[in-house]
Design a protein with these regions (language model features):
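ABC ATPase nucleotide-binding domains
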Residues: 6-12, 16, 20-163
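Non-catalytic connector elements of ABC transporters
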Residues: 171, 181-287
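A structure-centric signal for secondary-structure junctions around beta-strands
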Residues: 8, 92, 118, 170, ...
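ABC transporter nucleotide-binding domain
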Residues: 151-179, 183
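Glycine-centered flexibility sites
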Residues: 12, 33, 59, 70-71, ...
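Short, flexible helix/strand-to-coil boundary loops that buttress conserved ligand/catalytic motifs
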Residues: 5, 159, 167-168, 222, ...
């Protein structure tokens, strides 16, 4: 690919703002690139029909972009690229202008198309849910550098550093000092007290570090592991989740309860115990 001039690289591009010709119908927009390539009329018609089937827009051939919803316009932009049979597909935040429900629907369609067609796809997004749900591998970048390239599950559960842990999902961060290793746990002194974290061999005693604990990995009550007591500062009902902000020894800790139908929403000021296992606390060197 590096040895080819840009106009000879068979790359398809889908833009954030759709980039449709407003004076052209769906048919005109989708076949624009095919006509530039001077394909035979029969081939153009066949590719148009196949492309519209792939994006569920059969019957919309004679409509103009202004007569389509945002989701339908983005499907037209996808079809325009797919009819060119690209070797690589580039998508630059293609769903950012869509409403939440439509975004989820089109996201699922893009994933289905990518799997069905087997096209190598580079998808740029700031939406973490999009990145995790669409990708086979996710690259987290900062200032032009890739900090971690990994499958979504690995990226979420085993981030390479604090930046990745903070960028992907929600985390509680606790600053502390390593005190050494005990069994399978790394012992860290934090403002909450002593916390046992997932074991790391490269953090020596006395090393400043940061612990990351995801809200969904913290449970109500007392159990073996790390248990602390605090007071509810804010309680939020989010439908399938109860989100608590808890003051623990002057540190605000976020806690998610995933089965709210089994729990009453505790009011601000209520004392509560919270616990998490050592495996839920990831340690990183202080940056």
């Amino acid at each position: 690919m590096d040895g080819l001039p840009p106009w000879e690289r068979n790359i398809g591009m889908v833009f954030q703002n759709y980039a449709l010709w407003p004076h052209m119908t769906v048919r005109g927009n989708v076949t624009y690139g095919l006509r530039l390539r001077k394909l035979a009329r029969r081939e153009i018609v066949a590719r148009l029909e196949a492309g519209l089937r792939k994006v569920n827009l059969v019957g919309f051939e004679d409509r103009y972009p202004g007569q389509l919803s945002g989701g339908q316009q983005q499907r037209v932009a996808l079809a325009r690229v797919l009819v060119l049979n690209p070797d690589i597909l580039l998508l630059d935040e293609p769903l950012s202008n869509l409403d939440a429900k439509v975004r989820v629907q089109v996201r699922a369609e893009i994933r289905r198309l990518q799997k069905d067609l087997g096209i190598t796809t580079v998808y740029v997004t700031h939406d973490q849910e999009e990145a995790l749900s669409l990708s086979d591998r996710v690259a987290v970048m900062r200032e032009g550098r890739i900090l971690q390239l990994a499958p979504p599950k690995e990226l979420y559960e085993r981030p390479a550093n604090r930046f990745v842990a903070d960028f992907v999902g929600t985390n509680n961060f606790l600053t502390g000092v390593c005190r050494g290793v005990e069994g399978d746990a790394l012992v860290v002194e934090t403002p909450l007290g002593v916390v046992r974290a997932r074991r790391r061999e490269d953090l020596a005693a006395g090393t400043p570090c940061v612990l990351a604990v995801r809200p969904e990995n913290i449970a109500l009550g007392r159990a073996d592991g790390n248990t602390f007591t605090g007071r509810v500062v804010l309680a939020s009902y989010l439908g399938n989740t109860l989100r608590y902000d808890v003051d623990v020894a002057g540190t605000l800790v976020k806690l998610d309860v995933r089965d709210p139908w089994h729990h009453e929403l505790l009011p601000p000021g209520q004392e509560m115990a919270l616990t998490f296992p050592p495996s839920a606390a990831l340690a990183f060197p202080e940056e």
